[in-house]
Amino acid sequence: MSQVPAYKRILLKLSGEALMGDDSYGINRTTIEQIVGQIKEVVELGVEVGVVIGGGNIFRGVAPAAAGMDRATADYMGMMATVMNALALKDAMTKAGLIARVQSALTMQQIAEPYVRGKAMQYLEEGKVVIFAAGTGNPFFTTDTAAALRGMEMNVDIMLKATKVDGVYTDDPKKNPDAVRYQSVTFDEAISRNLKVMDATAFALCRDQHLNIKVFSIFKNGALRRVVLGEDEGTLVHC
């Protein structure tokens, strides 16, 4: 099998929940090390990697207190949770021998650089992993939308949406054992079949700007490497 990557630059979208492992909330150290190990594999192939991280694993712990809270305030809390995850991810990357930088859409100069497009692109070209934190920096936008936005700004070849399921299925594979994984599906087909790939705003951005999406499971050993090498892993959503 060829070891030449199918993509030169990728944007990896990680949900905060992916960092929980089997825990009910928070960050599972073993899980984050496993994810970083997969990222290291593709960096060593010469692939430039940007990461957008969610914050659900941390925000879940304070969600009861946020019930009834002003939506914008709750969203800002969620953004700060993504910064915590980004710092944990960077720490694990550093320990694994990777060079990583955190850029935040919210100004937190003591712990993260502000998001600057040109600087982020320079880091990618230098082989550094760039972790984009705090979503878009605006309430009412999800981290899926932030991933679509950063992916376009970084001129990535593809957006990789890492989930707990190894692709997009005809039905929920946990409930229906006869559900079949799509190898590929167009944006229009995904809409007509009501397939839940990501939130509507992010999906529309990717479709309109012709940014393909690959949905795969980050919990399958070596899955990220196989995706980057262009192997049959996950589901490709394309124009």
UniProtKB/Swiss-Prot annotation:
Protein family membership: Belongs to the UMP kinase family.
Record's function text: Catalyzes the reversible phosphorylation of UMP to UDP.
Sorted UniProt keywords: ATP-binding, Cytoplasm, Kinase, Nucleotide-binding, Pyrimidine biosynthesis, Transferase
CDD domains linked: AAK_UMPK-PyrH-Ec (cd04254)
A Pfam short name: AA_kinase
BP GO terms, sorted: 'de novo' CTP biosynthetic process; UDP biosynthetic process
Any one Gene Ontology molecular-function term assigned to this protein's record: ATP binding
Record-listed E.C. numbers: 2.7.4.22
Main localisation: cytoplasm
Claim: Metal-binding is one of the keywords in the record: no
Pathway: Pyrimidine metabolism; CTP biosynthesis via de novo pathway; UDP from UMP (UMPK route): step 1/1
Gene Ontology CC annotations of this record: cytosol
Protein name, entry field: Uridylate kinase
Gene expressing this chain: pyrH
Regulation: Inhibited by UTP.
Subcellular compartments: Cytoplasm
Subunit text: Homohexamer.
